[in-house]
Design a protein with these regions (language model features):
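Non-heme Fe(II)-dependent double-stranded beta-helix
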Residues: 2-72, 79-171
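Short acidic/polar capping segments at secondary-structure boundaries
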Residues: 156-165, 178, 189-193, 204-207
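Short, conserved beta-strand element in jelly-roll/cupin
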Residues: 177-193, 254-255, 262, 286-289
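Non-heme Fe(II)/2-oxoglutarate
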Residues: 2-24, 42-48, 52-55, 214-217, ...
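A short secondary-structure junction signal
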Residues: 153, 166-170, 183, 194-200, ...
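Short catalytic/ligand-binding loop motif for oxyanion handling, primarily in non-cytosolic enzymes
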Residues: 86-88, 194, 208-209, 270-272, ...
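Histidine-centered catalytic micro-motifs
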Residues: 170-177, 268-271
């Protein structure tokens, strides 16, 4: 064994019991031999079993109707989520006060991120962040994720300029990873059927025998997949193949402003394709933690000093990489209004 492999092997082996999903960057996770013996199948089955136990502990603190909605569909939709006054304040603030922003291009879509304040500076944005990490919302996001924990909401703008020669990878149905995980969007404006709304295959958060078999089959070839997202563990699936899983229909979710959508993105989902140029703004966050740990919460990222500054540090690190000649996928674009068109 080469010295470099001797160093990498124990690190890659330890990551079997982690949220690591990348078949191409981890020789153990990507080993067709080990996956033929059942490694990926085991990771999927065990992570879902552990998530079910953690969800059972969180369920009593949730609204019963939202538990039912999630179990049936894999997502929760809550309209009129923010208090009306706070909603109006944050929309007005984002329209009139520019914030530091970072942008990423994927295909013909631009994603702009603006971190919310990690401390109370008197702004509506800081108040929204506090609301989104209150115990009730935290429990809901943790339940959907299969493990409660800390998360850091950001203002996210999606600017879509349709271009058939440069497709948006988020328009393809996919699962984010192999275990339950949560993303949420608090939409600040109406999102119509032709404005790229969120779509989800109803019930696809459930690990059916057919889905487990499919995960196994994908794992055998994933490390050599031409699609980089597929090789990284975010498996793509065609609409034509959905019938084999025993799930429900592909549901599109146009929503009115001030709607919160929380989804388990182990389920198949996408940004609905549109040929209409659009710009939409939302508050977005994700919660993805080690799926093998038996408890909810109790994570280093939740230490107040760390939690309140994590996003600030992350974006500072991205800027530092860029200055060192290693540009990050997100580039600093200076001060922007949330709804500014992309450069």
């Amino acid at each position: 064994m080469k010295p470099s492999r001797m160093i990498a092997f124990p690190i890659e082996a330890a990551r079997v019991l982690s949220s690591d999903k990348n078949f191409r960057n981890n020789a153990i996770l990507g080993s067709s031999k080990l996956n033929r013996m059942g490694l990926h199948r085991w990771r999927v089955a065990q992570s879902h079993a552990a998530s079910a136990r953690r969800r059972a502990a969180l369920a009593p603190s949730l609204r019963p109707e939202e538990v039912h909605q999630f179990e049936a569909n894999g997502f929760v939709v809550r309209q009129n989520a923010l208090p009306t006054d706070l909603f109006r304040r944050v929309v007005d603030e984002l329209e009139t006060i520019p914030r530091q922003a970072w942008e990423m291009r994927q295909g013909h879509a631009i994603t702009r991120l603006m971190p919310l304040p990690g401390h109370d500076d008197g702004s509506a944005a800081a108040a929204v962040r506090r609301w989104l990490i209150e115990p009730e919302i935290r429990a809901l996001v943790g339940y959907v994720s299969g493990r409660a924990g800390g998360y850091n909401p950001v203002v996210q703008t999606i600017a879509n300029r349709p271009d058939p020669t440069n497709p948006d990878p988020q328009n393809t149905l996919h699962a984010d990873t192999y275990h339950p995980t949560a993303k949420f969007w608090l939409f600040l404006h109406d999102v119509g059927p032709d404005e790229g709304p969120f779509s989800y295959v109803a019930g696809s958060h459930r690990l059916t025998p057919e889905r487990l078999d499919w995960e196994y089959e994908q794992s055998l070839l994933a490390s050599d997949a031409k699609n980089a997202h597929h090789a990284s563990g975010s498996f793509r699936v065609s609409e034509a193949d959905l019938g084999v899983f025993g799930y429900g229909e592909l549901v599109t979710l146009p929503v009115p402003a001030n709607t919160l959508v929380v989804a388990d993105t182990f389920g198949f989902h996408r940004r609905t394709p549109t040929d209409k140029p659009t710009v939409r703004t939302e508050i977005h966050a994700m919660l993805r933690r080690n799926p093998f740990l038996p408890w909810n919460g109790v994570d280093v990222s939740e230490i107040p000093f760390i939690h309140d500054r994590a996003l600030e540090w992350r974006f500072q690190y991205r800027d530092w990489k860029t200055r060192r000649g290693k540009p990050d996928k997100y580039r600093n674009v200076g001060l922007r209004f949330a709804a500014d068109p992309a450069d």
